[in-house]
């Protein structure tokens, strides 16, 4: 009897999965565990393996088509076998095939250069079909991995070189796929379905900056982690959320759901998009433990090692544009969260202290919140609590 292969559920929040490319065609023999297709959903590209040995006798979902988890995408059976569709209940999650985690390239002693190259299966197949030299491609994915966008851009450049003079060239149309498609949908959904408001505040972190410089070398020596201002701000946010739980909530189905634990989402920028790894039960972590988790999660995200479960489930998020010189901005909520904190670029400025003018380091903070769940006064009180922690930082290390 033919075996049905379905779109796997990569995470609790997954609603649709896209078949990026088929590695096999109808009539091809397959081995158990062999990759038959690549799928992408929720910012992650993965492969689907054949659950049994046999022949690919039918493909139900075309390349580029999106379907819900549990939908049959193909059938594997005997070469002359016909497919008998099963009617009734959807496939249970326990019976769904397991998707392979993002491909990790291993340095095997006898491997060829082709095998050692960091490239996604989709990108490799498109490049080889088009006759592109893989060695000439520059990867922009995590860890320098060559992704689909790199190949499509290289093909576009190749066509451009063979096209009309520069003065006659037209604007380039870039299809919105993969991670960018997910980000676009979620950001539009966030703004359309919530009442977002951003308030700002400045904290004098002169004492904190001095403390950070004193503690960071010791932390690196003992624990292998440098302490940054972001780590202190994150710790302050966790403490402030415990005192102001309305910011650690969801607005869903006309109900406000407050969470007993702080699952902190820390936005990480990638070459081709943005992901938000989650630090669970952040309220149970010390400053150094929180710093280690933030650093490790960011590293895994940039190297493409973060799984789908590590990229969802946050109750409050933090994003930092300070490295780009941005001071205040309006972060967009990560639905269904009620709040997101934006960290700006610190700067030195003269400040009055009594009758004296002193040099102080100022850190701009921007808080976006959902006005359906939280009013302006509680949001301002949360920022005020953060300001207090940052200006008197002893509590952050206790």
Curated annotation (Swiss-Prot):
Q: Which InterPro entries match?
A: 2-oxoacid_DH_actylTfrase (IPR001078), 2-oxoacid_DH_E2_comp (IPR050743), Biotin_lipoyl (IPR000089), CAT-like_dom_sf (IPR023213), E3-bd_dom_sf (IPR036625), PSBD (IPR004167), Single_hybrid_motif (IPR011053)
Pathway membership, UniProt: Ketone degradation; acetoin degradation
Q: Where does the record place the Lipoyl-binding domain?
A: 2-77
Task: Tell me the protein's name.
Answer: Dihydrolipoyllysine-residue acetyltransferase component of acetoin cleaving system
Species assigned in the record: Bacillus subtilis (strain 168)
UniProt lists the family membership as follows: Belongs to the 2-oxoacid dehydrogenase family.
* N6-lipoyllysine PTM sites in chain numbering: 43
Q: Does the keyword Acyltransferase apply?
A: yes
**Entry cofactor note text?**
Binds 1 lipoyl cofactor covalently.
Catalytic reaction annotation: N(6)-[(R)-dihydrolipoyl]-L-lysyl-[protein] + acetyl-CoA = N(6)-[(R)-S(8)-acetyldihydrolipoyl]-L-lysyl-[protein] + CoA
Q: What is its EC number?
A: 2.3.1.12
The GO annotation for biological process reads:
acetoin catabolic process
**Peripheral subunit-binding (PSBD) domain ranges (all copies):** 118-155
Q: Which UniProt keywords apply?
A: Acetoin catabolism, Acyltransferase, Lipoyl, Transferase
Active site, per annotation: 371, 375
A Pfam family of the record is E3_binding
Enumerate the cofactors the protein uses: (R)-lipoate
GO MF terms here are: dihydrolipoyllysine-residue acetyltransferase activity
The gene that this protein is the product of is acoC
């Amino acid at each position: 009897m033919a075996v049905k292969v379905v779109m796997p559920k990569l995470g609790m929040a997954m609603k649709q999965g896209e078949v990026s490319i088929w590695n096999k065609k109808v009539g091809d023999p397959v081995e158990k565990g062999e990759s038959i297709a690549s799928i992408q959903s929720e910012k992650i590209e993965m492969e689907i393996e054949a659950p049994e040995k046999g022949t690919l006798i039918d493909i139900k979902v075309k390349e580029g088509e999106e379907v819900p988890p549990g939908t049959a995408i193909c059938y594997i059976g005997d070469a002359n076998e016909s497919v008998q569709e099963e009617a009734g209940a959807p496939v249970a999650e326990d019976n769904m095939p397991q998707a392979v985690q993002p491909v990790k390239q291993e340095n095997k002693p006898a491997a060829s250069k082709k095998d050692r190259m960091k490239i996604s299966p989709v990108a490799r197949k498109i490049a080889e079909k088009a006759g592109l030299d893989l060695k000439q491609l520059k990867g922009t994915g995590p860890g320098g991995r060559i992704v689909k966008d790199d190949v499509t851009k290289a093909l576009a450049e190749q066509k451009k070189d063979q096209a009309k003079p520069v003065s006659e060239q037209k604007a380039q149309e870039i299809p919105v796929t993969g991670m960018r498609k997910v980000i676009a949908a979620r950001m539009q959904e966030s703004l359309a379905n919530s009442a977002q408001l951003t308030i700002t505040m400045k904290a004098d972190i002169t004492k904190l900056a001095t403390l950070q410089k004193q503690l960071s070398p010791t932390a690196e020596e003992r624990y292998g982690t440098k302490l940054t201002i972001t780590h202190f701000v994150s710790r302050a946010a966790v403490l402030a959320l415990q005192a102001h739980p309305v910011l650690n909530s969801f607005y869903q189905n006309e109900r406000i759901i407050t969470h007993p634990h702080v699952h902190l989402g820390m936005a990480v920028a990638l070459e081709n998009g943005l992901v938000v790894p989650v630090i669970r039960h952040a309220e149970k972590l010390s400053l150094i433990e929180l710093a280690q988790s933030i650093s490790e999660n960011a590293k895994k995200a940039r190297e493409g090692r973060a799984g789908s479960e590590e990229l969802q489930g946050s109750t409050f998020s933090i994003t930092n544009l300070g490295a780009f010189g941005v001071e205040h901005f309006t972060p967009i909520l990560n639905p269904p969260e009620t709040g997101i904190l934006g960290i700006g670029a610190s700067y030195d400025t003269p400040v009055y202290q009594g009758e004296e003018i002193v040099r102080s380091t100022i850190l701009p903070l921007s808080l976006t919140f959902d006005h359906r769940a939280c009013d302006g006064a509680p949001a301002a009180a949360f920022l005020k609590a953060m300001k207090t922690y940052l200006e008197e930082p002893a509590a952050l290390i206790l």
